[in-house]
């Protein structure tokens, strides 16, 4: 792992210090501020996103409205280390992968990229009147759902068939004047899919190309899911997943910073010592 500057870190959205990342760069060059920060955590509206102030990623290209690659190069030239996000648990409904799935259904190469709710829980419950499999209580009693009801978004494919997908966070469904449904939301990724693993690898490579020295693992604890286990900080799945990500990041010398949703007193950080 490359040496990281453990001095003061600036945390900011790319458009929150003057409107663009270029404005933030100019601020950091200004004499009263110059040298004050060793690193800069640029929050993920740096990328192409649509919701949740950047945490609903369409793709990891740079959002040209508020930032450009030259801004990142300028920060590195100033000796400011970059901290960037990879959002592990979910992607935007507007992502190319989910849009391909909506159009092609089972013919899509991304049919296993997201979590087919009914397939995940097959044999563990009964289908309700909406076509959603309701798991028996024994399977979900230890699970943490962030909103009332089951965490699903039922989507309609281009051929008219419907299917529920795991949706931990935001969702919205609008119907236009022609009766067509339009979706917004953050769809959970199937971390066991080879294509998702490939996507993680490519994203880490992209972030390294941007100059990231530190990568924050957003929604890390929600991503590993297993029938009969917790869906949040499950053990050992959470730590196996972290090791896998660590191995992916190793060629780039980046430090990984997992988002851990727990108080310091719980000592979960101790589980990271073996990594």
Residue ranges of model-derived segments:
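Acidic/aromatic-lined carbohydrate-recognition and catalytic surfaces
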Residues: 2-195, 205, 220-272
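An active-site-proximal structural segment forming one wall of the substrate-binding cleft
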Residues: 195-214
